[in-house]
């Protein structure tokens, strides 16, 4: 509408990976998205900064209208064998502390087994968005967001859980990590709702953009109502 102020023009996407979360916010209507990751992300579809996410948000976070963070989940992921999880960083508390210092809405995303470290998270599932995957993920926020009930019966999973895999080098999981069973990468991208060139590893570490599109629309509606 002409003359309407844009209330969520800029979003900071921390630990951005290849952009699954960022793309969802873009589809929700966020004008500008800046992704930050310690590793190069050549297929990230928006402005990208290679940097330490927590150092970047401490210096620049106040210049954004909202912040999304997906701290590394290897300390909790069932795709990583238990004996290898020891010593993996749990950055959820440190990420929350950094975001709590800022007066902006934020969302923290992680895997279900990280739930004990998250504050009143809601769960999203691919089946709730008509996707043939489950990819359950938890979302914590300092503003109110709603979860959606799964629709496992209506949209059954076509892929086995990641922890049932036998060959980590040649196969892709749509539950997170690698899994037994090969399919065409275009099929995996379609199942995730990804329409840009993510590779196998990036897909395995991403979330479906539908999750943050849903959350982003809710954030925008909330901010417009203030």
What label would you give each PLM region?
Residues 1-7:
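Short, Lys/Arg-enriched N-terminal segments with co-localized hydrophobic residues
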Residues 5, 12, 120-122:
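Generic extreme N-terminus detector
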Residues 48-66, 73-226:
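Class I S-adenosyl-L-methionine
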């Amino acid at each position: 509408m002409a003359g309407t102020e844009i209330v969520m023009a800029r979003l900071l996407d921390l630990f951005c990976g290849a952009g699954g979360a960022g793309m969802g916010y873009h589809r929700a209507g966020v004008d500008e998205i800046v992704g930050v990751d310690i590793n190069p992300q050549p297929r990230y579809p928006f402005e990208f900064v290679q940097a330490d996410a927590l150092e970047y948000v401490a210096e620049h976070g106040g210049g954004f209208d909202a912040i999304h963070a997906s701290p590394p989940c290897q300390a909790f992921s069932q795709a990583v064998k238990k004996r290898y999880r020891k010593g993996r960083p749990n950055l959820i508390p440190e990420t929350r502390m950094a975001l709590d210092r800022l007066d902006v809405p934020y969302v923290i995303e992680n895997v279900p087994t990280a739930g004990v470290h998250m504050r009143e998270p809601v769960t999203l599932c691919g089946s709730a968005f008509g996707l043939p995957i489950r990819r359950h993920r938890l979302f914590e926020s300092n503003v109110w967001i709603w979860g959606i009930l799964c629709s496992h019966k209506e949209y059954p999973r076509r892929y086995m859980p990641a922890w049932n895999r036998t060959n980590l080098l040649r196969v892709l999981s749509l539950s997170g990590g690698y899994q037994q069973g090969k399919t065409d990468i275009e099929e995996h991208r379609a199942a995730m709702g990804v329409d840009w060139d993510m590779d196998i590893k990036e897909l395995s570490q991403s979330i479906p953009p539908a999750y943050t599109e849903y959350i982003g629309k809710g954030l925008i509606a909330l901010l417009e109502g203030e």
